[in-house]
Amino acid sequence: MKTLSMKHRVGIVWLQNELRTDDNPLLCKAAAECQQLIVLYCANPKWFDANRYGLRSIGERRWRFIWESLTNLDALLQQLGQQLLVLPQSPLHAIAELITAHNVDALYYAEHPGVYERTYAELLKRRYPLLQHHAVCSQSLWEQQQLPFTLADLPDSFSKFRRQLEQNDLRDAIPAPLSSPRQLPPPPAGLLAVPRQPLPVVTAPQHPQFVGGSHAAYEQVQAYFASGAASTYKETRNALDSWSDSTKFSAWLADGSLSVRRLHQQLLNYEQQQGANESTYWIFFELMWREYFHWYGRRHGRSLFAFNGIRQQRPQTSFYAGRWQQWCSGTTPFPIVNACMNQLNATGYLSNRGRQLVASCFVHELQLDWRYGAAFFEQQLIDYDVSSNWGNWQYLAGVGADPRGHRRFDLDKQTRQYDPNGDFIARWHGKVEATLDWVDAADWPIHPPK
């Protein structure tokens, strides 16, 4: 029973990449402090408009996955006495209207690694200085104050980052995941009765395995660890086209329907029951990569999207519309790249090895501006994560967190190693008649797949 002694009268929990009730510190904090609560998600119309690269921030497959996660979250919230309010507005407009209509006095949101998400939060602070703003850590393994360095002193490579964490035994210091609140404060009267604009239509077919939401995330985590595949992960992780050869947790981590701390707890449980080995460590190793890019995004802000990256060194690449179109549509002279791009366009997913190969081709063989590749991934990938995506593209373009810089993959060698019988190329129709097309900009604009 909520009483008048509670800290806030009406609070807004502004969800972004925390689409869960389990281990959600935003909901837990608001539940303890508010008499009434609005649980808000903003489907920003800008996501669905063409950006500077002629692409959308969210493609059809990722929007379907997010929509499924939102639907599942609403069902979970209803079990706790709440409902999810999804508005097709920018956070500034949506939150402003709710503050006025419901006398909101507290706002809860995540400490997000994305510079644009943080900009919205800063603008809200300036516009509503009397509002109590609660920025909460919800997307990382560690709290910022636990790191053995300041954000300004974030190591300039993953190897240095990992060594500092391991030298300080910080794995044992990862906070335990929180349980879901048993009950949430009710929404203000009349909140859901106001007519709203419709959300963007879901047009992509449902993926047979990547289904959004905490329920599907839980099933994938349980199935993966029950299969024993974690004990051989290091040997299988570079396969191009098998569901069980890698964890596939990334999509649910990306929209926050799966907590990274909950996942880490499940990994620890597996190690205690089945034994830790190099493969189970490598799963944690991948979580540390994700963690590094989380803080990398927080540290470097807008430089994450800059052509010269964080190293102030301009790449010797440009933009060629014909090559760009070939890469997007999987019609380059490189069959392994074509197969990967066809898989990405058809499913919204691509293996880690596949991502490295197509990015290397984009930068080296095709000599294209890496930002266009990163933007295409942003549109197409179901598991898009702002810091990991743009940070990894910088890494491969030689303008990011790679001391060796400008890494290039030998596509013929990679094909022999990872597709020796040509099964992957055949399955995804990688062999096409294509040559590099030296065209001028007259054929622009080109519309890549959605």
Which residues does each predicted region cover?
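Residues within alpha-helical segments
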Residues: 31, 215-218, 341, 374
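Glycine/tryptophan-enriched, flexible segments
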Residues: 150-306, 415-450
